[in-house]
Amino acid sequence: MRILSFMAMLLWSLCLNAQDSALTSGNFLTDYKRSYLEQELGIPLSTGGNLLLYDTISTWLGTPYRFAGNCEKGIDCSGFVNVLFDRVYGKKLGARNSAVIYVWVLKLNKDELQEGDLVFFRNSRKRISHIGLYLGNNKFVHASTSRGVIISDLNEPYYKRYFAGAGRYKADVIGENNSN
C-alpha cells in the first residue's frame, strides 16, 4: 500500500510539474517531442524546426534501401525525398530520378542551405546519382544504398568528395516540367 501511495504522489507531482511547465512555456508537448526527436535522431533541432519533418524522418530511419522502392519495406533515395515532400510539405516533386530533380531545382551554394533544401551527389562517373534532404548543421537525411534511411553529415569524407550541388524546390519550375 505504501508503494502504491508513493507512486500516486510521484505521478501527481509529475503532472503538476508538467502543468507548470506547460503554463510557462506554452509548448510542453512540442518541447517534449522536440527533445524526444533530438535523442531519436541524434541531432539538435532548432526551435523553429519543422516537427512534422523530423517526426516523419524518425518513422523511416533504418528502412532498408531498395532500388525503385517507395514504401516502409524498402525505399531508394529519390523515393524517400518524394515521400518527405509529399507528407511534410504537401508537394509533389514529379520525378523519381535525382538527376532530373537536380535539373529542376533552384541552384544554391552550400552556405545558402536551409532545412528542407535538397543535396545532390555524383557517382564515380560524374553523374548525379544520389539525393538527400538537408536538415541543418551540415546534416542531411537520405536512403543510403548500404545502410538504408540514415542521417549523415556533409563533412564526412565520402559525401564531401561526391557532393555535386544543392537546390531548393521551386514550384513554378517543377510545375512547368510536370505538365510536359
Segments from the language model and where they lie:
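N-terminal signal peptide c-region/cleavage motif recognized by signal peptidases
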Residues: 13-15
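Positively charged n-region of N-terminal signal peptides that target proteins for export
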Residues: 1-4
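Aromatic- and glycine-rich peptidoglycan recognition patches
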Residues: 19-45, 107-108, 128-129, 134-180
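Catalytic cysteine-centered active-site loop
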Residues: 40-44, 63-115, 169
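Extracytoplasmic/secreted envelope proteins and their assembly/folding machinery
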Residues: 50-54, 58, 78-82, 113, ...
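Structural motif
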Residues: 116-118, 138
